[in-house]
C-alpha cells in the first residue's frame, strides 16, 4: 500500500514536470484540489480527445469521492476545452477551474434533482 502511494506520488511528480498546469479558480479544500490536478494531469497525458479527458476526470473523481447514492446529494461534472464560456451552480467548496497545457478544465459538484417528466 505504501509502495503504491509512493509510486503514484512519483508519477504525479513526473507528470507535473511534463505538463504545464495552473489553478485559475478553486473553491475546494487543498487535498481535493491536489487530487483534481493529479487526475487532470493523468487524463491529459493518457487521452487526446476532449470527451475522453473529461470522462476520465469525472469518472476518477467520482471513484475517489463517491456519494451515498442519493439523487439529491450531488454529482461531479467536468468540462474540458480550449474555448468556451460557462456559468454553473456548485456545492460549497466543490469547484475548480484549472488550465492543463492548452486545455481549460472545470470540475464541480452540484445537486442532482430527480427529474419528473411533465414537471409533476
From Swiss-Prot:
InterPro entries cross-referenced by the UniProt entry: DLC_sf, Dynein_light_1/2_CS, Dynein_light_chain_typ-1/2
- Subunit structure as annotated in this protein's UniProt entry: Consists of at least 3 heavy chains (alpha, beta and gamma), 2 intermediate chains and 8 light chains.
A Pfam family of the record is Dynein_light
Family classification? Belongs to the dynein light chain family.
Any one GO CC term of the record = motile cilium
What's the protein called, per UniProt?
Dynein 11 kDa light chain, flagellar outer arm
**SMART domains, per this entry?**
Dynein_light
Q: What PROSITE patterns has UniProt attached to this entry?
A: DYNEIN_LIGHT_1
The biological process GO terms on file are:
microtubule-based process
Q: Where in the cell is it found?
A: Cytoplasm, Cytoskeleton, Flagellum axoneme
Entry's Gene3D superfamilies? Protein Inhibitor Of Neuronal Nitric Oxide Synthase (3.30.740.10)
Q: What SUPFAM superfamilies has UniProt attached to this entry? A: DLC
Q: Which organism is it from?
A: Chlamydomonas reinhardtii (Chlamydomonas smithii)
Its domain of life reads Eukaryota
Key words, A-Z: Cell projection, Cilium, Cytoplasm, Cytoskeleton, Dynein, Flagellum, Microtubule, Motor protein
Q: What is its main location?
A: cytoplasm
Amino acid at each position: 500500500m505504501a509502495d503504491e502511494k509512493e509510486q503514484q506520488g512519483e508519477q504525479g511528480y513526473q507528470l507535473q514536470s511534463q505538463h504545464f498546469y495552473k489553478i485559475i479558480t478553486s473553491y475546494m479544500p487543498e487535498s481535493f484540489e491536489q487530487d483534481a490536478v493529479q487526475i487532470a494531469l493523468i487524463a491529459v497525458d493518457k487521452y487526446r480527445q476532449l470527451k475522453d479527458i473529461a470522462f476520465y476526470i469525472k469518472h476518477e473523481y467520482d471513484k475517489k469521492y463517491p456519494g451515498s447514492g442519493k439523487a439529491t446529494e450531488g454529482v461531479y461534472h467536468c468540462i474540458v476545452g480550449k474555448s468556451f464560456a460557462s456559468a454553473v451552480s456548485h456545492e460549497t467548496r466543490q469547484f475548480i477551474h484549472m488550465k492543463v497545457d492548452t486545455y481549460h478544465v472545470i470540475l464541480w459538484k452540484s445537486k442532482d434533482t430527480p427529474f419528473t417528466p411533465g414537471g409533476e
